[in-house]
Amino acid sequence: MTLHRPHLSNAQGALLGALIGDAAGATLEFLGRIPTPDDLDHALTLPGGGVLRLAPGQITDDGELTLALARALCDAQEYPTEQVARHYQRWISSSPFDVGNATRMAMDCSGPGHTTAHVQMATNARRHNLESKANGALMRSSPLGIWTARLNDREAVDAARSDASLTHPNLTCQWAN
């Protein structure tokens, strides 16, 4: 997909904003209390640390999956379900330092009887995560907003729901995506 200015600048801002927000929020994740204004100011310096002991500016699993989705969408004209699933599987195979439970359950494609990656992931997701309203699909969705900007509303919604269905098939998650 080719973007022209100012759309390119907007797309870059959306993607970088999501990644910076992820790195800032990582400091506050699992804090166990409501963050204070001082906590928020500190988080915006991207200090790292937190429960996950991240390096300064390091993104979490949410940011890593955002990048995996962005890479899968780069040259696609239609939502590439199988290619997206393979990018997600490549990511989970890299032994990431943190993975949300619903995401892990959906992406576990080990064992015999493999079908295509997206069918296996969607089957796992329906089996294990149908009742889950976790936010893992939403956390990686910024590339969808960029990629679907050229589509009509129905096509954009279908792409977002298809992506959510790979790991978070609950209808609330699909529509939130």
Task: Describe the residue ranges of each PLM region.
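Structured, active/binding-site neighborhoods that engage oxygen-rich ligands
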Residues: M1-N177
